[in-house]
């Protein structure tokens, strides 16, 4: 099974302007071997109004992306309503309950983690969320940099993912970032 990655979502306001970014590394691991170093695990959805990223089984993640994107379209881009309906649908479907993937979805106002059990978790501060094998490293770095360093949002995401890549053997520093 393909696994291991780090995805970091970051949203907030700087200088009176809202921002939302998502970043991820490019490493794909199969067992104890790196099989790809430049994979893309982040996407822009609904006319570039929502960002998303996944960690876990690649095939499962694409199933989740497709399902979430369909619901997001039906809710006309309303992220909050979409994650609630996504969770309801996920829990009803026996196949989906076995998927081994997690997602972060965010826009300028909200950031959520969608877990492999169908749970929807809003980030504690509605600002920073991370998933994957290096997620805790990236989350810790992002919180510290957000609190003390006062970096531009893109630089904060990049530096946090670099720290995760230096610490987690399943995460590299081939970083891709999308922003709204």
From Swiss-Prot:
Allosterically activated by HslU binding. One of its GO terms (cellular component) is HslUV protease complex. One of its GO terms (molecular function) is threonine-type endopeptidase activity. The active site is at residue 5. PROSITE patterns: PROTEASOME_BETA_2 (PS51476). InterPro entries: ATP-dep_Prtase_HsIV_su, Ntn_hydrolases_N, Proteasome_sua/b, Proteasome_suB-type. It catalyses: ATP-dependent cleavage of peptide bonds with broad specificity. Pfam families: Proteasome. Keywords: Allosteric enzyme, Cytoplasm, Hydrolase, Metal-binding, Protease, Sodium, Stress response, Threonine protease. One of its GO terms (biological process) is proteolysis involved in protein catabolic process. It is found in: Cytoplasm. It is an enzyme of class 3 (hydrolase). Its EC number is 3.4.25.2. Na(+) binds at residues 165, 168, 171. HAMAP family: HslV (MF_00248). NCBIfam families: ATP_dep_HslV, PRK05456.1. Belongs to the peptidase T1B family. HslV subfamily. A double ring-shaped homohexamer of HslV is capped on each side by a ring-shaped HslU homohexamer. The assembly of the HslU/HslV complex is dependent on binding of ATP. Protease subunit of a proteasome-like degradation complex believed to be a general protein degrading machinery. This is ATP-dependent protease subunit HslV.
